[in-house]
Curated annotation (Swiss-Prot):
Glycans are attached at N351, N398, N425. The gene is PNLIP. Keywords: Calcium, Disulfide bond, Glycoprotein, Hydrolase, Lipid degradation, Lipid metabolism, Metal-binding, Secreted, Signal. This is Pancreatic triacylglycerol lipase. It comes from the Eukaryota. It comes from Cavia porcellus. The active site is at S169 (nucleophile), D193 (charge relay system), H280 (charge relay system).
Length: 465
């Protein structure tokens, strides 16, 4: 897959002019679709019969075996499609197919939390070609999705506002095309690492943008430039809410050695895909995990990932942060303005969710050189020990750090403190924490106190003050 990405960016496509198709209208290779610095290659989308877009319906009633539906009332009525439910389309990207495991896995995760029509859009006939051609074919894919949405509205009185399109890579821009063709009436579009080549910094008509739906949210996971870093995703903000997990460039767990990635737990094919495009694929894996972890992907408003990593963007500005992924639409300020940027950290493997806490420690006892660690205990769970500070430990000094826990502890009940000496000290000094303050991402503060001190490697439990 990696080789196809690289080669197809540099191979010429055949110039066309304009082509028209029944039902879908006309397509042009004039500017801005081609002949620009961002899209230098001329080319037209293929005939719909060649792309062969198929709609594969999964529902709570048929979670394991899809039903193929078309823009035909009798076909839809004989299926398990329900007009009183939301409909979520999933559109794959370059080289992929609608029957790939991750699309069905996303549907099955949805069925755990809601009753929904989940439609996997298969366009392998147009995705398994040169990238330059596939980037044109997504216009037809988007047009086909829009045609079905318009059909559902006109024939079954099904509102576009109940539609959510989830697109990965090129599928994000196909979703944008569907949104443009339905005049922004679609309820929501989620872009999962929208493809960069031929789309970044193009006019809005060409790519995904906030006007394509009532709400557009985007997850960026592979934003390095395609040349020379082989980053496949956009760094440009293109939604109402744009999330940059781990900075949006390099994802934890994507730097394993070649053998460990190819011999993946999910099989050789999935491992090979991860080796070729691990960062790019993380976007849909984060989304899938977010479905069953509604509070585990809080994004923090910040100027940059550097500021976020420097602990300058905590807690949530209004007491509530948007959740990256499935529940992004629950954020009250989701459409107050375009291009709102949010940052967060994730784990290096599933479950990717993390909960961020600020821990401030006021030291007591003797002056030594060492490092201190704190663990949290709450009514929902406990964390491991996290290092808060390393250096000169002076009584009365306050040190703070922010941690990303793989456990949501809930309401805190106690904390435990431990310290380690960096050098051998025969005087057996004692150090403690007179106060430890823990702040959750929602701004709630928990204070814990102790008058005790302990020797190195001895746990000290602090209770609420």
């Amino acid at each position: 897959m990696l080789l196809l990405w690289i080669l197809s960016l540099f191979l010429e496509t055949v110039a066309g002019g304009e082509v028209c198709f029944d039902r879908l209208g006309c397509f042009s290779d004039n500017k801005p679709w081609a002949g620009t610095s961002e899209r230098p290659r001329k080319g037209l989308p293929w005939d719909p019969s060649a792309i062969n877009v198929r709609f594969l319906l999964y529902t709570n009633e048929n979670p394991n075996n899809y039903q193929r539906i078309t823009a035909d009332s009798s076909v839809i009525r004989s299926s398990d499609f329900k007009t009183d439910r939301k409909t979520r389309f999933i559109i794959h990207g370059f080289i992929d197919k609608g029957e790939e495991n991750w699309l069905a896995d996303l549907c099955k995760a949805l069925f755990q939390v809601e009753s929904v029509n989940c439609i996997c859009v298969d366009w392998r006939g147009g995705s398994r070609t040169l990238y330059s051609q596939a980037s044109q074919n997504i216009q037809v894919v988007g047009a086909e999705v829009a045609y079905l949405i318009n059909f559902l509205q006109s024939q079954l009185d099904y509102p576009p506002s109940s539609v959510h399109i989830i697109g990965h890579s090129l599928g994000s821009h196909a979703a944008g095309e569907a949104g443009r063709r339905t005049n922004g009436a679609i309820g929501r579009i989620t872009g999962l690492d929208p493809a960069e080549p031929y789309f970044q910094y193009t006019p809005e008509i060409v790519r995904l943008d906030p006007s394509d739906a009532q709400f557009v949210d985007v997850i960026h996971t592979d934003g390095n430039p395609i040349i020379p870093n082989l980053g496949f995703g956009m760094s440009q903000t293109v939604g109402h809410l744009d999330f940059f997990p781990n900075g949006g460039l390099q994802m934890p767990g994507c730097q394993k050695n070649i053998l460990s990635q190819i011999v993946d737990i999910d099989g050789i094919w999935e491992g090979t895909r991860d080796f070729a495009a691990c960062n790019h694929l993380r976007s849909y894996k984060y989304y899938i995990d977010s479905i069953t972890n509604p509070k585990g992907f809080a994004g923090f408003s910040c100027d940059s990932y550097s500021s976020f990593s420097s602990n300058k963007c905590f807690p949530c500005a209004t007491g509530e942060c948007p959740q990256m992924g499935h529940y992004a639409d629950k954020f009250p300020g989701k459409t107050k303005e375009n291009f709102q940027n949010f940052y967060l950290n994730t784990g290096d493997k599933s479950n990717f969710s993390r909960w961020r806490y600020r821990i401030a420690v006021t030291l007591s006892g003797q002056k030594v050189t060492g490092h201190v660690l704190v663990s949290l205990f709450g009514d929902a769970g406990n964390t491991k020990q996290y290092e808060i500070y390393r250096g000169s430990l002076k009584p009365g000094n306050n040190h703070s750090n922010e941690i990303d826990s793989d456990v949501d502890v809930g309401d805190l009940q106690k904390v435990k403190f431990i310290w380690y000496n960096n050098v051998i000290n025969i005087t057996l000094p004692k150090v403690g924490a007179s106060r430890i303050t823990v702040t959750r991402s929602d701004g709630r503060v928990f204070d814990f106190c102790s008058q005790d001190t302990v020797r190195e490697e001895v746990l000290l439990t602090l209770q609420p003050c």
